Amino acid sequence: MGITSSKPVSGSNTTTNSPTNQKAISEKKQKPKRTNKRNLSTDSKSSTCSSPTNNYLADELVVDLNSMEIEGADSIQYSGHSHSSSMTNSMTNSMRNSANEKQLQQKQQQPQQQPQQQQPQPHQSHDDLNSSALDQDDGEFNNNFENESEVESISSSSINNNNTNNNSNNNNNNNNNNNNNNNNNNNIPSISNISNNNINNNINNNNNNNSCKQKNSKNKKNKNKNNNNKNSSSSNERPYSISYDNEGSTTKSNSTLSLYSNISNLHSITSHSIQDASIVCENCNHHMTKPIHLLSLSLEPTSAASLDIHRNGNFSITLASNSRSSSPATILQQNNKHFLINSNINIINTSLNNNNKNKDEDNVNNNNGNNSNNNNNINNNNDEDNDEDNDENNNNNNNNNNNNNNNNNNNNNNTSNNDIPDLSWTNYNSDSFNNNNNNNNIFNTFLSISSPISDQQNTSPQIQEIISPLPSPPTVQQSDVIQQTTTTSPSPLPSPQKQKQQQQRPLQKSSPPPTTITTSTTTTTQFNNNNLASSLGSTSDLFNKSLISSFLNGQGISSINNSNPFENSYKNQINSSTNSGTNTFSNTNTNINTTNSSNTNVGYDQYSFNYSNGSNSNINNSNNGLKSFLSNSNSSFSALKNCSYDAKDMSSFTITLSNSELNTMIAESLNRSSASNSIVKSSNTVHTTSGGNNSLCSDGYNQNIISATTNTNTTTTNSSSTTTTTTATTTTASTTNNNINNNNNNSTSTTNSTKDITFLVCDNPDSTKEKSNVSNTSSIISASNLNRHITPNSHMRPRGRSISESLIMSPINKESLNDIQRAIESEKIKKTKFEELKSILGEREYIIDINDIQFIQKVGEGAFSEVWEGWWKGIHVAIKKLKIIGDEEQFKERFIREVQNLKKGNHQNIVMFIGACYKPACIITEYMAGGSLYNILHNPNSSTPKVKYSFPLVLKMATDMALGLLHLHSITIVHRDLTSQNILLDELGNIKISDFGLSREKSREGSMTMTNGGICNPRWRPPELTKNLGHYSEKVDVYCFSLVVWEILTGEIPFSDLDGSQASAQVAYAGLRPPIPEYCDPELKLLLTQCWEADPNDRPPFTYIVNKLKEISWNNPIGFVSDQFYQYSEPSTPRLALSNQSSNSSSISLSPTKL
C-alpha cells in the first residue's frame, strides 16, 4: 500500500472528475478520526523555507509497506513537516491511478469490518499492492491503519487527487507508450513497480532558481487548480522519519529511517532495507557551498548508515542492510548533483537537465513522462514569461509546450540545451543475474558504469570522483561458495517482458563468454554487517578537513577540485589505473577492478567499472586507507603518527599477520598465564602468490582475536597484449578478502613493499574488563590499541576524547605522543637485548671468573657494597662488590639469597642477572645507563630542573613496575625494599626492579616472621612493619608501589617536610598519607588509595593492579586531560631524562640510607 502525505482538498476542482473518487471521499468523511502517534506543528499554509543553513527537503513521503521484506509492519509514524511538491503530485498521482481500478474492485468485495490485527502476509507482487493516502488535518497525520478496510477507504479517497491535471497542455509531450487508462501520461509509475522492473530515472534538478521562498499570493490563486500546492514549503527544520514495528518476531523491534539534509537538490532516496519505501522531496532552490548529508537507517541495533565526506564537497551515503535484506542503497553526489543507486533496481538511468531559464519563477512544475522502459523524466523546463497565468499553468503538474519531454524506448531524454549527458548505470549480466529476490546475488548491488561523463556549458569536464561506500553482504552460511561471472563488454538490454520473466525464475549460473573475468569468493558471517555499520560520527567542517576523514575515506583520488593536502602521500597508497589523458576513477571502500584500455579517450568513450562479484567478497573492510598506509613503506606520511583515534574510527581495523611462526607464538602467548609482555612483529607484504585464512583466537581473550589473513584475488585484463597485476594484502577482522587490482596496459610491474609493525600482546588471563587486554597502557598509536577494535560485537566505548578534540592537541599532547612512540621503540630494542642476553647465559654457568671482567669506573658506594661499571665478554655490565660486615656466615647467606632471587627473576622488568663471583663476592648484572628513578626525579646532586612525566608515561612506568612485582610474587619472592632508589632505568627509559639484598622467599603459609633490622626505607615503609606486628605478607610491596607511583606522578619525595622516622611513625599511627594532586585521573587516584590502605588485607593484589592500570590507559588513549596538568607539565621539560653524571648510573643501587 502506498502512503503519501498529500492531503486531498475537498471542493477542489481537481478532485471532482470521477464519481468513484467522489464516493471514496464521501466514505472517507464518514470514517471516525483516528488518533495519531505524532503531532506535527507545522503551519502548512504560510510556512516558508527560510533557513539558509539547514533545509530539510523531504517534501513528500511515499512508502510501500507491502513490498517490504519485513512482514507484519502495522504502524507508520511520521515526524517532521510536509512540503508541497509538484513533482510529488505526479508521483503520488501515478501511484493512485496505477491501482485505482483494482482497489475499488477489492473494496466492493471486502466486508465492512476487518480484524484489528492482520497476520503477516507473504511478499506480494506489485500488481496486488494497494495505494492509500495519508490523512492530514490541521498539520496532523493519522497513521494507525488498524484494518485493511480503513486503509482502502483512505486510499480511494485520494485517488483522483490530480486526475484533472493530466488533461491539459500535453499535446507536445511525446510518449511512445500510453498504457494507463486514467490519463497517466504524465505520471511516474508507482513505487511498487520499481522493485520489480528495470527503471530509468531521469531526474532534472532545478538548480537555477535563486530563491527558496515562494509567493504565497500566487499559491493562493492556484489553490483551486493544484490542491497539492497548499503546503508550499515549511521552515520547520525537523527531519522526517518512518518507523514501523516488526510483528514477525517474538519481540517487537522499532525501526526508524531518518533523513537529515541541508542540500538543495536532493530529490529522492530509495532505501533497499525497506525495499520500495521512498522519501521524495522537492528542490527548494537553495544552494549550499558545502553540502553535508547524514542518512541513517537502523533496522537492527548494529545497523546504521555510512557517510563519506571529501574535501572537495563530494560525499556518499550508504544505508547498511540488515539480515533480512540483501544489500544497501547508495547515494552519490558530485558538484552539488546527486545520483541515486538503488540495489533493488538493476538498471537506473539518471539524467540531470538544468533547463529552467526563469530564475524568478515561484515554483516550477516537474513534467513527467512514462514510456515502455518505465523512464521517469522530471524536467524543469520553463521558458515562459513571469506573468501569473503562466505561474498557474506551471503549478498544474502538466507538460509545458516546450517539446522537451520526449521519451522513447531507447531511454533518450532530448532537451533543448542538453546541458548534462546521461550517467547510465547498466547491468551487463541481467540475463543471468536479474533476480531481485536473490539475496546471494551481489550483482544486484554493484552496477557497471558506462559513460560517466559530466559536460556542463561545453567545457566537458569529467566527473573526477565516484564514491560508493561498502554495502553489507547478505546473511548466508559461511560454508557457501558463490561463483559469479561478469562481462566487461556491454550487452543489449532485455525487453520489459523478458526482464519480468527473469525476475520470476530462480538464479542460475551462466557460462562466461571469452572476454570475462571470473572471481570465486567465500561468504562470511553476519558480523561483517556490523563492521560496516560503524558511524563516522562528526559532520563538522573539522571532520571534513581532518586527517581522520582523509585516510578513513581513502582519498587517494586524483581530482582537479580536490585540495587534499595529503594527496601526494596517497598516490602510492591506493592502486588505480591511470593512462595518458585519462582521469583516475577510484572507490573508497569497495574493491574495484579498474581497467583502462589504451584506446580510451576523454569525452564520451566508455569507461568500464567492473565491480567484483560475490556475496560477501571484498566488501567488508571500511578502512582501506589504513590498509594502504600500512602496506606501503615508501609513503612519506604515516597514518599512525600524531593522531588520535577512538573506537568509532577503527571499528573494523586490525593488523594482518603473515608469518606462520609469529602466529604460533601469539597463540601460545595468549594461552599462557604468566604476567610478561610479548612483543609481536608483523610484516605485511603486498604481493603474495596464494591465499589462505589463518585465524588465531583464544576463548578467554575476546578482544585479542588476531586474524592472519593473506587473501589475494588476481585479476588480469588483456589489452594491447600487456597484462599487469598488482595485488594488495588485506587488513581485516575476519576472513573477508579485500583486494585492489590495478591493470595498467602500458607497463608490467609487481609491487612488493613491507612495513614492520611492533605491538604488545598481553597474556594475562585475569583481566577485569574485556577491553583491558592490551598491555601497552599509554600508547594510542601502536597496533596494540588498534587490536582492541577487532571484534565487531564490541559494546563499550572508551572514555577518551572525541575526534574533534583529539585533532586539536596542545604541545603537551604531541610531546606525550612522541614519548609513547619512543617508548614503543625502546620496548622493541629492550626485548631484543633481553633475548640476546638470555641466549648467551642459557648455556653457561652463572659462576664468572673475576679475570674475565673489565672494571672501568666506580659509579657508587654504600655501607654494604660498591658498584662498578665494566664489561664482560662484550656485554656492558654493572659489578656489585659486597663488603663483608659482621658475621661471615650471615654475609654468605645474604649473598647466596640475593643471587638465587636474581636467577629466579627472569623478567624484562627485572634487572638481568648475568653471573656471580665468590672470591671476591661480586654480583654481575646488566648495566642500566639511565640510573635510578630517584636521581632522575629529584636530582639531589644536580642543579638541572626535575623531570615531570606526562600522564601516559606515568601509566606506562607504573604498569612496568607492577608487572615486575607481579612476576616476583608469582615465584613467591617479596622484595621488601621497593623504593625509587631501587627502580632503575636503561638508556631508553624502561623501568626495571633491582637490589634483592633484602628480598625474601615467602613461606607456604603466606606470611613471614618479622626480623630485626630496618626493612625498607622509612619514607616508603609500610605501617605493619613500623608497628612490628610480628607477621607480614607480600602486601608490603603493594604499599611501597603506591608511594613510588605517587612519586612519579608528582615528582616529589614522599613526606619531604618530615624526617624519615617521623614520617613512618605518622603513617603507622596517625594514618598519614601523601596528598594526591587534582590533575590525577580519578580511577588512578582510587587505585592509589586502595594500595596504601592500613590493613594489608584491604590492599589489592598485583593481578588486579595490572589490569586496572590497563583499563585506565584504555579509557585515556592520550592521557588524562586537565588544565592543572597542563600547567604542571611544562612543554619545554624533557619527558625522558638520564642522569647527567654517568658516575651515578648503576644497575645495582646503593644500600638505602636514611634521608
Curated annotation (Swiss-Prot):
Biased region (Acidic residues) positions are 382-392
**Binding positions for ATP per the UniProt entry:** 859-867, 880
Stretches assigned to the Protein kinase domain: 853-1126
Q: Has the keyword Transmembrane helix been applied to this entry?
A: no
CDD domains in the cross-refs: STKc_MAP3K-like (cd13999)
* Compositionally biased intervals (Low complexity): 10-21, 41-53, 79-123, 142-214, 225-237, 364-381, 393-419, 483-525, 575-599, 1138-1155
The record's annotation in InterPro entries points to:
Kinase-like_dom_sf (IPR011009), Prot_kinase_dom (IPR000719), Protein_kinase_ATP_BS (IPR017441), Ser-Thr/Tyr_kinase_cat_dom (IPR001245), Ser/Thr_Kinases-Pseudokinases (IPR051681), Tyr_kinase_AS (IPR008266)
Biased composition (Polar residues) is annotated at 243-253, 453-465
Q: Keyword set for this entry?
A: ATP-binding, Kinase, Lipoprotein, Myristate, Nucleotide-binding, Transferase, Tyrosine-protein kinase
Lipid sites, type N-myristoyl glycine = 2
A Gene Ontology BP annotation from the UniProt entry: cell surface receptor signaling pathway via STAT
Q: Which GO terms describe its molecular function?
A: ATP binding; non-membrane spanning protein tyrosine kinase activity; protein kinase activity; protein tyrosine kinase activity; STAT family protein binding
Name one cellular component (GO) term. Answer: cytosol
Tell me the domain of life. Answer: Eukaryota
Give the region (Disordered) as residue ranges.
1-54, 77-253, 352-423, 453-529, 571-599, 710-753, 1134-1155
Pfam families reported in the protein's UniProt record: PK_Tyr_Ser-Thr
The reply to whether Oxidoreductase figures as a keyword in the UniProt entry is no
- EC number(s) per UniProt? 2.7.10.2
PROSITE patterns hit by this protein: PROTEIN_KINASE_ATP, PROTEIN_KINASE_DOM, PROTEIN_KINASE_TYR
Gene3D superfamilies found in the cross-reference section? Phosphorylase Kinase, domain 1 (3.30.200.20), Transferase(Phosphotransferase) domain 1 (1.10.510.10)
Active-site residue numbers = 977 (proton acceptor)
Sequence ranges of Basic residues compositional bias:
215-224
Q: Which reaction is recorded as catalysed by this protein? A: L-tyrosyl-[protein] + ATP = O-phospho-L-tyrosyl-[protein] + ADP + H(+)
Similarity comment: family membership: Belongs to the protein kinase superfamily. TKL Tyr protein kinase family.
Matching PANTHER family, A to Z? MIXED LINEAGE KINASE DOMAIN-LIKE PROTEIN, SERINE/THREONINE-PROTEIN KINASE TNNI3K-RELATED
The identity of this protein, by name, is Dual specificity protein kinase splB
> What organism does this protein naturally occur in?
Dictyostelium discoideum
